[in-house]
């Protein structure tokens, strides 16, 4: 049996007190209490062997709703309860099946390498009470999963050469451990990193011209530059069809905040956010990291003069990546 005792603890009591005593505030209080009760009932659907003392919001992710599930026992881990956004990932079963294959394979590789601290180096998802092979539950049209919380770990938002090198090593090691995965993973977001598809989308956007900007000189200049690069941008897809370039298990969302660092920042502990793990070309992961990390501005920066390519981050990430990935890459790759 699962012993679950719910205590309304910070930050929710402070939030409740701050809402005031008006009818509208009272309704909000009731909704918060109902949310806590609902979250507790969802946790109970997983094979948790600890006493839950608190559930509170965690992180600032844009895709999934995430909560920290705090347990009372010192010898038991805390957990992370997460609602999967099935509008972004409509095939939840495929997402979790991919994750199960990947995390199981990584765990086996780490054990073979002599790693004993598995908890901090690979995500662990809990099965449901009703089905030991199922890693998510559906409640009122929403899909939830529960994983072990990795403590003594931090995420980073900013990138410097040191963290870029560590990220390169980590993502390269991630791919290396999965280079021999025997199972074919599903494509959780169709054509997510398919450059041929993306270029066709761009052409269609030009035809529709919804914003009425197609004839602007700056837009025409950008389209001309993209046209010059289109053949190189789609080379991977062509080589793949010719059988010259393999698709591998890739993360497909290689940002620096999709990995956990040790508290002192000296080591990458674990690659996280595995919803987009799927077959792709290795350039997807390599280039996707540099797309954000090596830029001096945000990806939606309208002032082009602020956008520069950071050679120091590029070189550090490349050295780190090749140090881990060189062992399995083909000469063409």
List where the protein language model places each region.
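Short, Lys/Arg-enriched N-terminal segments with co-localized hydrophobic residues
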Residues: 3, 20-33
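Active-site activation/catalytic loop segments of kinase-like enzymes and analogous catalytic loops
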Residues: 283-326
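ATP-binding pocket architecture of kinase catalytic cores
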Residues: 76-98, 104-186
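Juxta-kinase regulatory segment immediately upstream of eukaryotic protein kinase catalytic domains
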Residues: 33-54
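Catalytic activation segment of kinase domains across protein kinase-like and atypical kinase folds
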Residues: 257-296
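ATP-dependent phospho-/nucleotidyl transfer catalytic cores
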Residues: 56-60, 82-93, 150-165, 169-170, ...
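ATP-binding glycine-rich phosphate-binding loop
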Residues: 51-72
């Amino acid at each position: 049996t699962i012993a679950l005792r719910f205590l309304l603890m910070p930050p929710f009591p402070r939030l409740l007190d701050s809402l005031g005593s008006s009818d509208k505030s009272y309704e909000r209080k009731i909704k918060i209490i109902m949310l806590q009760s609902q979250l507790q009932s969802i946790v109970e659907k997983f094979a948790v062997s600890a006493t839950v003392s608190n559930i509170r919001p965690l992180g600032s992710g844009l895709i999934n709703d995430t909560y920290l599930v705090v347990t009372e026992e010192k010898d038991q881990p805390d957990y992370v309860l997460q609602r999967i956004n099935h509008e972004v990932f409509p095939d939840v079963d495929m997402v979790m099946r991919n994750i199960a294959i990947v995390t199981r394979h990584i765990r086996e590789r780490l054990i073979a390498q002599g790693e004993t601290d598995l908890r901090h180096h690979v995500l662990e998802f809990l099965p449901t009470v009703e089905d030991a092979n199922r890693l998510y539950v559906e409640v009122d049209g929403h899909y939830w999963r529960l994983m072990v919380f990795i403590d003594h770990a931090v995420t980073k938002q900013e990138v410097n050469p040191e963290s870029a090198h560590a990220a390169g090593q980590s993502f390269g090691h991630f791919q290396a451990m999965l280079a021999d995965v025997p199972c074919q993973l599903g494509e959780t977001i169709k054509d997510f990193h398919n450059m041929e598809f993306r270029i066709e989308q761009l052409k269609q956007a030009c035809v529709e011209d919804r914003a009425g900007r197609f004839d602007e000189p700056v837009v025409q200049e950008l389209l001309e530059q993209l046209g010059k690069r289109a053949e190189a941008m789609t080379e991977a897809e062509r080589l793949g069809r010719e059988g010259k370039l393999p698709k591998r298990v890739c993360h497909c969302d290689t940002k620096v905040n999709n990995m956990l660092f040790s508290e002192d920042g000296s080591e990458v502990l674990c690659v996280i956010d595995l919803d987009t793990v799927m077959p792709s070309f290795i350039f997807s992961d390599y280039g996707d990291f540099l797309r954000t990390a090596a830029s001096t501005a945000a990806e939606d920066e309208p002032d082009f003069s602020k956008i520069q390519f950071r050679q120091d981050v590029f070189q550090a990430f490349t050295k780190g990546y090749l140090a881990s990935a060189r062992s399995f890459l083909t000469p063409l790759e």
